[in-house]
A protein has these predicted regions:
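An anion/pyrophosphate-binding glycine-rich loop and adjacent beta-alpha core
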Residues: 1, 27
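Conserved lysine of the Walker
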Residues: 118
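Active-site phosphate-binding and catalytic loops of NTP-dependent enzymes
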Residues: 29-31
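Post-Walker A alpha-helix
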Residues: 121-122
Length: 280
């Protein structure tokens, strides 16, 4: 089967039981216009591992970048493997580990470390009317500095899974994969293909580094350009490979974007700040 995520397409070989989960997330996407960019497999690493403590491995062109995982985590390893393919092979764009949300044709990127609450924030905003361009990766044009959308789900972990289900009971989730190296994981379908096709490359108006703190008020800290440059470039998968091209596009972004770090305990406070103070 072919998985179309917009900018990239994956030809996926996998066990039959995995295809239903893939269809629940990507089944409404149209067939890509061009051949697949990547050929990947999620299969058992050996015949015995199909039956004794079943495991699955991810392969891209016969290369397996991860250790085998329990077969119950097959969909999770597919999503992580797709991220790996893009981050490792596409050096025609700047790729930043960040969420991207858009409103009124204005993009905000949220680079963040694990545990920052980035994906919970992304899910909440995407299901509250914002356009989801990405949960995991900002795809930025090297010349224009515009950020492009990907058709991907939101990866939620641990307590945030039940929180989002409580806030949005009609939302579409995969099963929850227990005890992965990231904890309990589930993927949320936060958009539709028909909506995705309306998205276009968009200017980045703000770079915001979020950090969730239980019961915290919203604390907002302005960053200077040097601070933002250092942190944004460190969050880029291929900044070092791009050399001067990477430097130039990061420099372009921080010169024209609002730059903040925020601490938050209530997502409604974040939404109010973004809608009232960032988006025009």
């Amino acid at each position: 089967m072919v998985v179309n995520i917009g900018l990239y397409a994956f030809k996926v070989t996998c066990e039959q039981q995995l295809t239903s989960t893939i269809d629940s997330i990507y089944g409404d996407a149209s067939a890509p216009d061009n051949p697949a960019d990547f050929e990947v497999k999620v299969v058992s690493p050996s015949f015995l591992r199909r039956f004794i403590r079943p495991q699955m491995s991810f392969y891209c062109d016969q290369h397996s970048p991860f250790k085998p995982l329990p077969a119950s985590q097959a969909y999770a390893i597919l999503e992580w493997g797709m991220n790996w393919c893009i981050a490792t092979h596409d050096h025609t764009r700047l790729l930043v580990h960040a969420a991207v949300l858009v409103k009124n044709d204005q993009a905000i990127i949220f680079p963040a470390l694990p545990g920052s609450g980035k994906s919970t924030l992304t899910a909440y905003m995407a299901l509250s009317g914002w356009s989801l361009y990405s949960d995991e990766m900002a795809i930025i044009d090297l010349k224009s500095g515009l950020v492009s959308p990907l058709y991907r789900p939101v990866c939620l972990k641990n307590d945030s899974i039940d929180l989002v289900k409580k806030w949005f009971p009609d939302s579409v989730f995969t099963s929850t994969w227990k005890d992965t190296h990231k904890g309990d994981v589930a993927h949320l379908k936060a958009s539709s293909w028909s909506r995705y096709t309306q998205y276009t490359p968009t200017e980045i108006v703000a770079v915001i580094f979020p950090k969730y703190i239980l019961n915290s008020d919203l604390n907002i800290y302005s960053l200077n350009q040097l601070q933002a440059f250092e942190t944004l470039s460190k969050n880029a998968f291929n900044y070092g490979v791009l050399g001067r091209l990477g430097f130039n596009v990061v420099n372009k972004i921080i010169k024209r974007a609002a730059l903040f770090e925020i601490e938050f305990g209530d997502l409604r406070d974040v939404e109010a700040f973004l809608s009232e103070d960032i988006i025009k």
